Design a protein with these regions (language model features):
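Glycine-rich cofactor phosphate-binding loops and adjacent beta1-alpha1 units
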Residues: 169, 184, 188-233
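Glycine-rich beta-strand-centered segment in the early N-terminal region that forms part
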Residues: 22-40, 51-93
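Cytochrome P450 core scaffold surrounding the K-helix E-X-X-R motif
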Residues: 43-49
Length: 233
């Protein structure tokens, strides 16, 4: 058995309780992680409040990212081994002593990072890297526009894009949030409640890539803000 933090009923933080659960067993292509640290993300708070349901077949325990040591490997796992330190993206279950996830969702702890630091990488850094750099192909010198710059994804995207030499533009919902985006390295931060981002980007020659986590009416406006041959992710 293992210790885990479970949600007794939807509500405030006091509905989180320590409980005993069976240690998960890895299936094919999966690993069991002995958790050292678990990240805290917005979906965890939403799940606690009864506003987020885990994916079908996932653990009902909160926790979407964690770091630790691989305790067991399922059949067919290659490139990972028992005792290896990793950080991992989870479908749920990170608030426990052990958690199971796909081996493909694990990343060796980067050089210079300890397990505490590594626990905060999967949820936002995996998302930004796969969407902005692998799918979007962001390159140094390109104009990069992202919406929701003060969110977890947004703050990560600003820093990564700036580190790789892109020009970063962002939108946020208040002047204070815009200032925070500028402090993180954005070249321009637009308060979308007061200013339209489309003419601003058109004046810059258009965005080479836009990361949109909003959708809806923003899709048409994003297309107007794109440069020729720009990419909307």
């Amino acid at each position: 058995m293992m210790r885990a933090i479970e949600i007794s009923a939807p509500g405030a933080p006091d509905v989180l309780h320590l409980a005993e659960r069976p240690v998960p067993v890895p299936g094919p292509g999966q690993v069991v992680l002995k958790v050292a640290y678990a990240g805290v993300n917005r979906p965890d708070a939403l799940q606690r409040a009864g506003l987020y349901n885990p994916p079908a077949g996932a653990s009902d325990l909160p926790g979407l990212e964690a770091s630790g040591t691989i305790a067991a490997c399922g059949a067919g796992v290659l490139g990972l081994q028992q005792g290896q330190q990793v950080c991992a993206l989870l479908p749920g279950g990170g608030y426990a002593e052990y958690a199971v996830t796909q081996a493909a969702h694990c990343l060796p702890v980067p050089n210079g990072f300890d397990l505490k630091q590594a626990a905060c990488l999967p949820e936002t850094f995996f998302t930004v890297w796969s969407n902005v750099f692998q799918r979007g192909g962001l390159k140094a010198g390109e104009r990069f526009l992202l919406h929701g710059g003060s969110s977890g994804i947004g703050t990560t995207a600003i820093q990564l894009a700036r580190a790789f030499g892109a020009r970063v533009f962002t939108t946020a919902g208040s002047d204070a949030k815009c200032r925070a985006c500028l402090d993180l390295g954005a070249e321009r931060a637009v308060n979308y409640r007061e200013t339209d981002f489309v003419p601003i980007m058109q004046g810059e020659g258009g965005a080479d890539i836009i990361l949109d986590m909003v959708g809806g009416e923003y899709i048409a406006r994003n297309l107007d803000a794109l440069a020729d041959d720009g990419r909307l992710v």
